[in-house]
Amino acid sequence: MVTDEARLASICCSTRGVEYRKIYMFEIKDACLTIGRRTIVRHFSFCAPDGQISVVQGAPRSGKTLLLAAMLGFVPLAEGWVTINGEVLNPSTACFFRAQMAYVPQTFSVPMPTTVAQVLDIVSTGWRKYEGRTTIADVQQSWPALALDPQLWQVNFNALTPDVRKRILLSFAVCARHRVLVVDEPTEGQTPEMAAAMMRLIKAEADKGTAVLLTTTSDEVAAEADNTIVLRGAVE
């Protein structure tokens, strides 16, 4: 069950007597998401406006990650639609739109021994860049704030603990210079100090005009949001 189903779904404005619908950078409208015969989310509407932090909050197994997968075009909606900058996301456009987003998944590993530097090379290859290829020097600017050691570049990514992997991926994402930043459970498994550091970095991206979309179980993360919607229920 979703509370506040229509929160920030659509805003109408009037200028010189002409009404128009404000275009948000990231919007999901009247969405229904099902697994088999079970409805996980019903008539869900939400927006992630430019320059703001928007949060989908819920308990573990409430469907947050599944909903995020649908919003990114990985999982089809039973009803409703997702738009990016006013354009509808569908199977033929999903890859194009995802390439314009910086996405940090809840968990991530690579299928073979790969250094952190090689992971950056793999990830950045898929980014649609406006200012050239992202380099180690670009990414490393945020590493002191995230307590990341420069020697990690030559370490096997899969050998690192999940909390360190998440901070590394966030450092990659903020260098992508995309208009949308999506992070699934940004502070999960982090110390309070590191969680606060990550949220400062994320807030700095919103302050630059990026549309930020987060999922979380944390009240502390939700407290940092400009817009929050809560999922209730469970995915079995």
Regions found by a protein language model. Name each.
Residues 181-185:
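Catalytic Walker B motif of ABC-type/P-loop ATPase nucleotide-binding domains
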Residues 80-89, 97:
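Conserved ABC transporter NBD signature motif
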Residues 142-159:
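Conserved ABC nucleotide-binding domain
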Residues 26, 41-43:
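Conserved structural motif at the start of ABC-family nucleotide-binding domains
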Residues 169-170:
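Hydrophobic anchor residue at the start of the ABC signature
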Residues 107, 113-130, 138:
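Q-loop/switch helix immediately C-terminal to the Walker
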Residues 72:
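Helix-to-loop junction immediately C-terminal to a conserved catalytic motif
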